[in-house]
């Protein structure tokens, strides 16, 4: 996977590059600067970056927070670092509570989804400023467990668990599913399987895994044809859903041709203990059945918006 990290901080890029199992490219460009809450600021920066780069990317927006100063500078960290810098120590003169932390908000964005990961790195403010050509705040922040400012620990000063969480997110199985309406009915895959001596019954929106070098749209149409034997085309992308083991992308699709019948691997492995059946289910009956994931909620919302 190719991924862009929009950052002017070379050390942040190197720290991220060591953790992510992707082809990571650094891009330096100015981003929109607004006042607001840290999370809101980070999301708007990511959206601004995506408009300019138009590739899957991440940004990492950091806020330096001092609880005894009401979490100042917080969202004004960049401005304070440029103007006040390590002179921030003067504001702490006589203050016995020198606790502080970095709030890192990592945002991943692509054409289909947006993922926000927040992490905090706790520490204390040093009594004196470290020497050397470093970022001003890095010369006065001592991470918990260390005895000197993080500027002296260049190897891992910008590493945080957010990159690990992002790496796990990017590795999740990607799935595309297509919602097809026939008048007031929706096409679903009925499942009945034996598990721990009990039969589990549920429905799923037709779809499956995205193969290598296949787009999400191509996977949606291919899976629909393999599972239900019908040809369709994409009307619009709807939304994504993240769960423990994967990420699902939902599309509204239009029926073109073909007789509805079970096909593909589902037909080959169909048996009484692992049963598949393609069904047209009235939208009015969705509350009476269980559809895997957010299926029922998404179908009803789409039906109200596009079909009702």
Briefly describe each language-model feature range.
Residues 159, 164-170, 200, 261-308:
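Nudix hydrolase/Nudix homology domain
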Residues 171-188:
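Conserved N-terminal beta-strand and adjoining loop/helix that marks the start
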């Amino acid at each position: 996977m190719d991924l862009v990290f929009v950052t002017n901080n070379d050390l942040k890029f190197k720290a991220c590059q060591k953790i992510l199992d992707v082809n990571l490219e650094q891009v330096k460009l100015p981003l929109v600067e607004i006042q607001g809450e840290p999370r809101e600021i980070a999301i708007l920066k990511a959206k601004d970056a995506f408009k300019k780069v138009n590739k899957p990317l991440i940004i990492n927006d950091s806020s330096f927070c001092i609880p005894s100063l009401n979490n100042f500078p917080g969202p004004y960290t960049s401005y304070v670092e440029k103007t006040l810098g390590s002179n921030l120590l003067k504001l702490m003169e006589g203050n016995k509570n020198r606790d502080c932390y970095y709030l890192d908000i990592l945002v991943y964005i692509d054409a289909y989804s947006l993922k926000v990961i927040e992490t905090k790195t706790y520490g204390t403010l040093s009594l004196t400023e470290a020497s050397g050509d470093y970022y001003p705040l890095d010369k006065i922040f001592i991470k918990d467990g260390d005895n000197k400012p993080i500027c002296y620990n260049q190897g891992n000063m910008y590493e945080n668990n957010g990159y690990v969480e992002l790496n796990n997110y990017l590795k999740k199985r990607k799935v595309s599913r297509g919602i097809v309406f026939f008048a007031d009915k929706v096409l679903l895959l009925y499942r009945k399987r034996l598990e721990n001596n009990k039969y589990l019954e549920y429905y799923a929106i037709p779809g499956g895994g995205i193969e290598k070098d296949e787009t999400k749209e191509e996977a949606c149409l291919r899976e629909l044809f393999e599972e239900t034997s019908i040809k369709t085309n994409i009307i619009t992308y709807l939304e994504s859903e993240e769960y423990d083991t994967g990420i699902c992308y939902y599309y509204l699709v239009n029926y073109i041709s073909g007789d509805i019948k079970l096909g593909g691997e589902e037909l080959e492995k169909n048996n009484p203990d692992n049963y598949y059946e393609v069904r047209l289910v009235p939208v009015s009956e969705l509350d009476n059945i269980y559809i895997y994931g957010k299926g029922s909620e998404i179908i009803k919302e789409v039906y109200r918006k596009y079909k009702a």
